[in-house]
Amino acid sequence: MPFKKINLLILLTIIISLTVLAFSQTSPPRTASSGVNGWKKLTTEPFRGKQDDVFFVTPDVGWYVNGSGKIYKTIDGGSSWALKLNKPGTYFRAIGFIDQQRGFAGNIGTNYFPNVTDTTPLYETSDGGETWKPVAGVTEQMIKGICAIEIVKKPFINAGKLDYKATIYAGGRVGSPAFLLKSEDNGASWQSIDMSRYCQMILDVKFFDEKNGVISAGTDADVQKSNALILTTGDGGKTWTKRYQSNRPYELTWKSSFPTRKVGYITVQNYNPDKNATERVVAKTMDGGKTWKEILLVNDFNVREFGIGFIDEKRGWVGGTMSGYETTDGGKTWKPVEMGKAVNKIRLLKTENGFVGYAVGIDLYKLEYLNK
């Protein structure tokens, strides 16, 4: 790797590290409290920095992961959490489960963040997260690191019972290289797809079924040259089509949310040091990812976007540097809401009477909404 490229990657790493450190130093103690908009901060173990992913299989059973190599589990909707894995040197960036027993956790890999020594890209559990082991046959040659895990379940009849066949995708990573893992047999075997002809960074992966999917990406490993990029596939990841590319440097798309098959939103991250570059935008599609338009989130140089989640086509949230943002009109207008700092992932699950939401960043927040 050229010396200049290494220096630029180190610079980006330092910027991200200093940013999340600043968040953590101003973060209050982690005790349960209520936000004015209904988001409630849950009691969790203190962590200095941005935590990256949370996943729930039911409104009550879920897990979250962070960069210190820890995986936590709750069975009571976040009222209490149990530490299930503590693996220093591992940076868990993503987590996903097929059901309450079988799941996967992705590691960012080495040569990006400091103090990360684990080269194992992907871990798995078959007992609800009580124990974890490296996924057999998946090496760093297949994928250097993982930023997102997506699981698509298709129902089928198995010996007279309704069962599910899972197709699993794991993509990465920030800073390059760009690879996509795919399993079509519940994680028993894996194939690696080299994405370097299409993009240089993969930040999020969304699939609607086994064939049709969307990737949030960056055009260049050098962030000062990178444009935000969105790709789609209709053949299970064999080929990809560019659907959106920003015309600004220092950008990449970060996280996605599709409340319906047609309507979707993706955060556009901006690292431009020019203080005149103040617009922060979200990409929106209304035709399933074929075309995209930019909608203004906020005009503020100090804001960086992270996670995003929409419960329907109109109402959703974006995690920002110091607070979150909420819209109830499909992104036409946004208002600040207290849901934690640097929220990197928002998970929303529908319930009988409404929905429940979880948002992880510096802290972990929960929203319970009942239909009127």
Model-based region annotation:
Residues 30-43, 69-85, 121-138, 181-194, ...:
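Asp-box/BNR beta-propeller loop motif
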Residues 43-68:
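Beta-strand-rich domains and repeat architectures in extracellular enzymes and scaffolds
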Residues 50-53, 91-96, 143-151, 200-206, ...:
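Repeated scaffold domains used in trafficking and secretory/extracellular systems
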Residues 61-63, 101-105, 160-169, 211-215, ...:
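Entry beta-strands of beta-propeller and related beta-repeat scaffolds
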Residues 66, 106-109, 170-173, 216-219, ...:
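Recurrent small/Gly-Pro-centered beta-turn motifs in extracellular repeat architectures
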Residues 110-114, 174-177, 220-223, 271-274, ...:
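Short glycine/acidic-enriched loop and turn motifs that connect beta-strands
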Residues 299-323:
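Loop/turn-rich, solvent-exposed surfaces of beta-rich toroidal or solenoidal domains
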Residues 347-372:
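Blade-level signature of beta-propeller repeat domains, shared across WD40, Kelch, NHL, RCC1
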